[in-house]
Amino acid sequence: GQYSEAIKVAATSPRGVLRTPQTIEQLKQVPTQPGTLSPILQYFGVLLENSSLNKYESLELAKPVLAQGRKHLLEKWLKENKIECSEELGDIVRTHDMNLALSVYLRANVPNKVVACFAETGQYSKIVLYAKKVGYSPDYATLLRHVVRINPEQGAEFASSLVTDADGPLVDVERVADIFLSQNLIQQATSFLLDALKENRPDQGALQTRLLEINLVNAPQVADAILGNNMFSYYDRPRIANLAEKAGLMQRALEHYEDLADIKRVVVHSNLFNTEWLVEYFGRLTVDQSLAALYEMLKSNMRQNLGVVVQIATRYSELLGAPRLIEMFESFRSFEGLYYYLGSVVNLSSDPEVHFKYTQAATRTGQVREVERICRESNYYLSLIHISEPTRRTPI
């Protein structure tokens, strides 16, 4: 009974002269009687009935209340403005309830702890809004690294919001890429960079190259799709060509190579290309490049490459010149190739040499009826007698 009276006296003393840390420490030392509330909690109860608590009192009340698992009381007093919020109180509450700690930090105006709580509770969209409102500038890179480690998917969303902020990027794009790749998060890094680089700016060439590099090494089909969409224009083309070749993306490699030695090395693998695409590709090359590449294809693997070489020779016969193509096939003694190539152009040609070489190739490949037809129907049949003597010695 005496303790109860003493508690009331201390709690209601004029101008709070007895409302001191020393009083609190003394009451904490008083044993609790069975079936009663501890003296210190009785003291705080009287204070809460008549006023609100100061910083020190709030801390000393929070400790036993939270220890007893009665955080709902703390929430009630917080809403009633009965306790004074501080960073120290937030730190105590944080080990029990992150959202309640967030409320404390917000009221106490502790920006760094508020931002940390937003991150811990997954409220990433609120971080930038809050920071701008209170004029606080967090270390967004460090914050992002923390978010990415906890939740990579939300980290990607948060990263995009940081670099596309209305007031300008809040974190460097390359720094963000480093953060994702340091965690080996290739998919998230790709998703982020595709969004961040969508404007296809000249100053982003190095990042375009990096995006393609990481996918050519780790996910070639993704790189193939990106290149196929023609999204970027400023990356290191020779570097990407080389990596595409190593990844087995021969078409992409050939699209990017400009050096003839590189073109010849890749084009010989005709079995790895869509034939129609490969034929169209030769339309981009000069005459000398085309002939050099065709020679290399026949030299490397005639059995594999002859069919597409014939198609290319046929498509670009007028440009490359029949005499040079005839010479090419003859240099490899490919009368089959010569027969199929000339067979596609002979009916449109007025060159006696073409008709003669076709007849000769047909003979060498056993196409007797075709020999008879061309000799019978060719308008240039009589011209064959004017062929030079060395050539006519070859039996037809």
Where do the PLM segments sit?
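Extended alpha-helical assembly domains of large eukaryotic scaffold proteins
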Residues: 1-388, 392
